[in-house]
């Protein structure tokens, strides 16, 4: 039997649990295109305009708003209504003078929170690769790649960025404004698990080789808990480097 290509439909009952939308009013919803964020951790732009921000009554109106270039994501006009918008992305509507940052609430649901810093964004380093010339390419959580030029690839002191660290970058220019290392004592935002949406201090990092690293944290109530490194997004020292 021949291949039928990628899936194009998504039933509401099968939509990711992070999506806060009525499940039984209609049968289908918008399926996001493959992109910078996984479907389980992002929302298509159409749902943000129609269901979250309530700027449209139906899909047709939402598409029209998007196609007219009225919506910006990370400082760039986006005209694809199925574009996946995920964690830390900035959604802007210049005509309404409104800016929102995508975060998770205490139940793990995707929420848009008004932001006072729409020109910067926090990005987690997911991976690093060495490219031609010995320069370092940082692969960030939102699909971005930033190349760090090094004068001498043999000098380890020039390689200051590690996986798990966080960068504060300008958008859309991608200029690095600040670097927050993943280390004990840093403030972290929890992106998954039982404590999703919480802020907590890193107390201990347990390196486990081929197994996921375990991080011990302490929240603002003094409660200690453990989670995997993938769920830990460092955001500052005593306070987040930008308001979240």
Curated annotation (Swiss-Prot):
SUPFAM superfamilies: Alpha-L RNA-binding motif. Keywords: Ribonucleoprotein, Ribosomal protein, RNA-binding, rRNA-binding. Signal peptide: none annotated. PROSITE patterns: RIBOSOMAL_S4E, S4. Residues 43-108 form the S4 RNA-binding domain. Gene3D superfamilies: 2.30.30.30, 2.40.50.740, RNA-binding S4 domain. GO terms for molecular function: RNA binding; rRNA binding; structural constituent of ribosome. The keyword Hydrolase does not apply. Coiled coil: none annotated. It comes from the Archaea. The keyword Phosphoprotein does not apply. One of its GO terms (biological process) is translation. GO terms for cellular component: cytosolic small ribosomal subunit. NCBIfam families: PRK04313.1. Belongs to the eukaryotic ribosomal protein eS4 family. This is Small ribosomal subunit protein eS4.
